[in-house]
Amino acid sequence: SQEAVVDRKNKVVKRLVTGVRAKLKGAGVTVVKAEAKILCRDENGVVVQSENVGYNSKFLLIATGSSAFIPKIPGVDKAIESGLAITNREALNLVEIPKTLLIMGGGVIGLEMADYYSSVGSDVVVVEMLGKIAGATDEKVSAVLQKALEKKGVKFRLSSKVKEITENGAVVETENGEEEILADKILLS
């Protein structure tokens, strides 16, 4: 079941995070989860201040994490609020498989999700602004990847963009004009 898949994923992630924390602690690394400011460099290394506490170290690793890009298109805010539009974080935690999934973006995340959700039964459409998938990937590799995903049932709208998100899908601007694509979920990737 999808619920078991999500539960297993969460357990694996927790175990990995715990392992990384233990390795960092064992190596004498101080981890600060807060906003910080690099003040200067001195004879001992880098001087950093966070929440009125100073740190001095020979090495500094800044791990900011990431957040999903939310495109500025009509209807996106309402779609996020209603749960129609989701980011990759929500997609990794869905316990119900959407019957139809529209994926905005044919990059790494979008293609991974297209592969997974098509293999568990979703009808998947990927909308990509470029004329090929997988961004800067070699064109031959991109074509082979697209063909493999199409064999799994994934549909592509290349050289296209989502113009508007509606209550039950999206209006997509393609080379042949506008097309309305119905979707249970829209992944912003």
PLM region spans:
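FAD-binding core/adjacent interface of flavoenzyme oxidoreductases
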Residues: 14-104, 171-189
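Rossmann-like dinucleotide-binding cores of NAD(P)H-dependent redox enzymes
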Residues: 6, 12-17, 21, 92-93, ...
